[in-house]
Curated annotation (Swiss-Prot):
InterPro entries in alphabetical order: EXORDIUM-like (IPR006766)
Source organism of this protein record: Arabidopsis thaliana
Keywords attached to this entry: Apoplast, Glycoprotein, Secreted, Signal
GO CC term, one of those recorded: apoplast
A Pfam family it matches: Phi_1
Record has Nucleotide-binding as a keyword: no
Major place of residence: secreted
Carbohydrate attachment residues: N102
Protein's recorded name: Protein EXORDIUM-like 7
Alphabetized PANTHER family for the sequence: PROTEIN EXORDIUM-LIKE 5, PROTEIN EXORDIUM-LIKE 7
Residue ranges the record marks as coiled coil: none
Subcellular location: Secreted; Secreted, Extracellular space; Secreted, Extracellular space, Apoplast
Gene assigned in the entry: EXL7
Family listed: Belongs to the EXORDIUM family.
Oxidoreductase in keyword set: no
């Protein structure tokens, strides 16, 4: 349900062809350790899913373009060169509901609302996010209870309950008493000012604790040159995968507690390539400017997004996998 903060300390070797190789072998997960189950609830399976963005706070148009292009890349009419964001989404789509319907193939950006006046202040809670959605719905956006998905993105000066201490993002569903219907939504914040070392890792490094023996490594260069935004992209991908496979908290997850589930992206937290796991990010790419990425998007964009659990392979997987 939430992207929980975990530090990952990477140990990588750079090969002559510009690709990273982890010192470890295959640690992409083990089916023996995973208790992922289907709990008979829905997945987001509409043939076309309408995505609505709520930009909360003051946003740089360049930052918005990077995020929009990622969302366009999920189901672009002309997918980017392999490995692409749309290839990554194919792994998410493996999950079905009890009718046999897979997760949606087409995610369409259908509307945006800019809440630049901070209508509910600069300090939000998990519950007040629903009021933010209500404000957007009464101002501009439609209430789409049929095939709508709402994405609340907060600027780097907005504080969120548990942000930087326990979470980088979360998903849930709205209450009819607040919004007027039950619709799935996700929240992700820009951590650049508050905790980039936690929610934008590996583009920012945690400060070593005195006496810990930990030596900070060279920071990875973000593929779009924006530490906070490039960090947000992976969290957005994480939450999109999980809200799609577990929108009402009774779909796909592991564990006994539906209010604190281990979902399909949680199982692969910190894994971005082959060999990843146990604190290693895995094999990823570097471009000519030494920016790190593992998938390509529309308009020549590149992104670094974490893998998700592959239902068929019984391990974490992404399109940049070496095997």
């Amino acid at each position: 349900m939430s992207l929980i903060i975990v530090f990952f300390f990477f140990s990588l070797l750079l090969t002559s062809n510009g690709q990273f190789f982890d010192e470890s072998k295959n640690y992409e997960g083990s089916s023996d350790l995973v208790d992922l189950q289907y709990h008979l609830g829905p997945v987001i399976s509409s043939p076309v899913t309408s995505l609505y963005i709520i930009w909360y706070g003051r946003w740089n148009p360049t930052h918005q373009s990077i995020i929009r292009d990622f969302l366009y890349s999920v189901s672009a009419p002309a997918p980017a060169q392999y490995p692409s964001v749309s290839n990554w989404w194919k792994t998410v789509r493996l999950y079905r509901d009890q009718t046999g319907s897979n997760i949606t193939d087409t995610l369409v950006l259908s509307g945006e609302f800019h809440d630049s006046t901070y209508s509910h202040g600069s300090h939000l809670t998990r519950f007040s996010v629903q009021s933010v959605i209500r404000t957007a719905l009464t101002s501009k956006l439609p209430l789409n209870a049929v095939n709508g998905l709402y994405l609340v993105l907060t600027s780097d000066d907005v504080e969120m309950q548990e942000f930087c201490r326990a979470i980088c993002g979360f998903h849930y569903f709205t209450f009819p008493s607040v919004v007027g219907a039950t619709v799935p939504y996700a929240w992700v914040g820009n951590s650049e000012r508050q905790c980039p070392e936690m929610c934008a890792y590996p583009f920012a490094q945690p400060k070593p604790f005195p006496g810990s023996g930990f030596v900070a490594r060279e920071k990875m260069k973000p593929p779009n040159g924006e530490v906070g935004i490039d960090g947000m992209i992976s969290v957005i991908a994480h939450e999109l995968a999980e809200v799609s496979s577990n929108p009402m908290l009774n779909g796909w997850y592991g564990g006994e507690d539906a209010t604190a589930p281990t979902e399909i992206a949680d199982l692969c937290l910190g894994v971005y390539g082959s060999g990843g796991g146990g604190g290693y990010m895995g094999s990823v790419y570097k471009d000519r400017w030494r920016n790190v990425y593992n998938v390509k998007g529309v308009k020549g964009r590149k992104y670094l997004i974490q893998w998700v659990w592959d239902l068929n392979r019984n391990r974490c997987f992404g399109p940049n996998a070496m095997n």
